[in-house]
């Protein structure tokens, strides 16, 4: 059976429907940065997702080609994730999605080196005839965070965030969202195929002890 990050690391991908504390270690990602309303058809955000999956599957399917990745094992491509912020507000203003800035990411297995990533960029560019110059190798260590499973529409996230904020305050922490630690979402459902009320999204915020 292919290694499934969601099942093997449930503490990061399958939180309960109530807030909980988690310490997230250093991870490597395929990443694309941008600024746009994520709901725009043919917009920058949706194009970024195409780029991410292009590289993710080039790496996954390397097992069938000449480029051998040391330590490779078969795996399920991890879910799409996103770091979100807006320059003009403290937190997230869901009524002005056109102001969203974001880093879209897909987690990389630890065996993928920067050299393997660079090979995948060249290989995908050659095979798919697309421009992958915006795609980067990103390393992040989120550290101490609060997270919660949000069930339902993305537009209903403020209620889950409010519950997280109350949990943070009640337990002697405070939000630590900054230019380097951001609002984080992990998408466990495909919004193109799942009804809004059935979407499952992990929401994660950085925190620090008071």
Question: Could you tell me what each predicted segment is?
Answer:
Residues 1-210:
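A solvent-exposed interaction/effector surface
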């Amino acid at each position: 059976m292919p290694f499934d990050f969601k099942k093997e690391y449930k503490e990061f991908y399958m939180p309960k429907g109530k807030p909980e504390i988690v310490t997230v270690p250093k991870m490597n990602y395929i990443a694309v940065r941008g600024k746009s309303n994520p709901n725009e058809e043919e917009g920058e955000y949706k194009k970024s997702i195409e780029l991410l999956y292009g590289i993710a599957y080039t790496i996954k399917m390397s097992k069938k080609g000449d480029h051998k990745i040391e330590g490779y094992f078969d795996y399920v491509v991890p879910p799409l994730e996103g770091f979100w912020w807006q320059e003009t507000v403290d937190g997230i203003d869901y009524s002005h999605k056109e102001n969203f800035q974001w880093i879209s990411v897909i987690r990389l297995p630890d065996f993928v080196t920067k050299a393997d990533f660079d090979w995948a960029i060249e290989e995908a560019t050659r095979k798919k005839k697309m421009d992958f110059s915006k795609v980067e190798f990103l390393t992040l260590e989120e550290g101490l965070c609060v997270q919660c499973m949000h069930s339902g529409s993305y537009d209903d996230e403020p209620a889950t965030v409010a519950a997280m904020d109350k949990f943070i305050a009640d337990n002697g922490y405070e939000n630590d969202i900054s230019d380097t630690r951001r609002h984080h979402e992990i998408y466990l459902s495909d919004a193109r195929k799942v009804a809004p009320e059935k979407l499952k999204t992990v929401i994660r915020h950085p925190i620090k002890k008071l």
